[in-house]
């Protein structure tokens, strides 16, 4: 059920992106070479049937690949054929540097008159007659608007709880490393998701971003001594 919802919203985002790029001309080292979910075992390959049914239900294009098919779309995997048995490729997926994209998008929005007030601390949300009347900030006082959107991730529950809104949101910590491409022929071309270790490897121009792990550790931003061991293992295992 939740996966179906995620597929629908990701498809909507994917379909809106080309128009936004065409209109703004934003550069974000984007690629249109899909995402390859890599299976290391036959059990994982067979178990992907449920995912395939959801993708088909919501018209999300995909193809099921054997080992040779995976190597055809990601040639560097030819160096480690024993590490995987096949994959599920989401052919319409795009990749790119999300930070580069959002910074450029904010600049475009500012050119159109959008005001960004960075560094503000929220003291609370003002409610009048059962409706949000403004956001109380430390430096700018009350900020008002026609519509209010709370997009604070795992911090949203703290802000909304005082006005009676409870969100089932909790922080989950992930880890990533960014590495330079030293040999194009031995590097990934798009995004590869290691199904076993839940680690994503993404090509960002002349860099590779490797991200994964889901650690329930509260709001601590501390990095343990072995925090990136898994993501480093995966990139070295698949792209030695």
Indicate residue ranges for each PLM-predicted region:
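Active-site substrate-recognition segment that forms the wall
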Residues: 1, 78, 122-132, 142-240
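General beta-strand structural signal in soluble alpha/beta enzymes
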Residues: 63-66, 117-118, 150
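Dinucleotide-binding Rossmann-like beta1-alpha1 core, especially the glycine-rich loop
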Residues: 1-67
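Alpha-helical scaffold segments in soluble metabolic enzymes
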Residues: 16-19, 50, 104, 108-111, ...
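Conserved beta-strand segments of alpha/beta enzyme cores
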Residues: 61-63, 115, 166
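Helical element adjacent to the flavin cofactor pocket in flavoenzyme catalytic cores
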Residues: 46-58, 78-146
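Short beta-strand to alpha-helix junction loop
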Residues: 3-14, 37-47, 72, 88-107, ...
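Alpha-helix N-cap/helix-start capping motif
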Residues: 42, 67-68, 99, 120, ...
């Amino acid at each position: 059920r939740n996966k179906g919802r995620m597929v629908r919203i990701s498809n909507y985002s994917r379909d809106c992106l080309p128009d936004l790029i065409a209109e703004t001309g934003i550069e974000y080292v984007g690629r249109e070479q899909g995402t390859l979910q890599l299976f290391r075992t036959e059990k994982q390959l067979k178990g992907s049937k449920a995912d395939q049914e959801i993708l088909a239900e919501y018209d999300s294009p995909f193809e099921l690949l054997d080992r040779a098919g995976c190597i055809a779309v990601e040639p560097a995997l030819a160096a480690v054929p024993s590490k995987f048995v096949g994959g599920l490729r989401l052919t319409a997926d795009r990749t790119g540097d999300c930070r580069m994209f959002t910074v450029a998008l904010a600049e475009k929005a500012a050119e159109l008159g959008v005001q960004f007030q960075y560094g503000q601390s929220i003291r609370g949300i003002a409610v009048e007659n059962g409706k949000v009347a403004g956001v109380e900030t430390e430096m700018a006082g009350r900020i008002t608007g026609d519509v209010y959107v709370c997009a604070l991730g795992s911090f949203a529950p703290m802000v909304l709880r005082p006005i009676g809104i409870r969100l089932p949101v909790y922080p989950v910590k992930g880890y990533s490393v960014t590495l330079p491409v030293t040999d194009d022929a031995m590097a990934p071309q798009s995004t590869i998701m290691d199904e076993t270790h839940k680690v994503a490897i993404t090509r960002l121009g002349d860099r590779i971003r490797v991200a994964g792990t889901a650690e329930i550790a509260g709001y601590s931003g501390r990095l343990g001594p072995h925090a990136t061991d898994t993501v480093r293992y995966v990139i070295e295992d698949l792209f030695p």
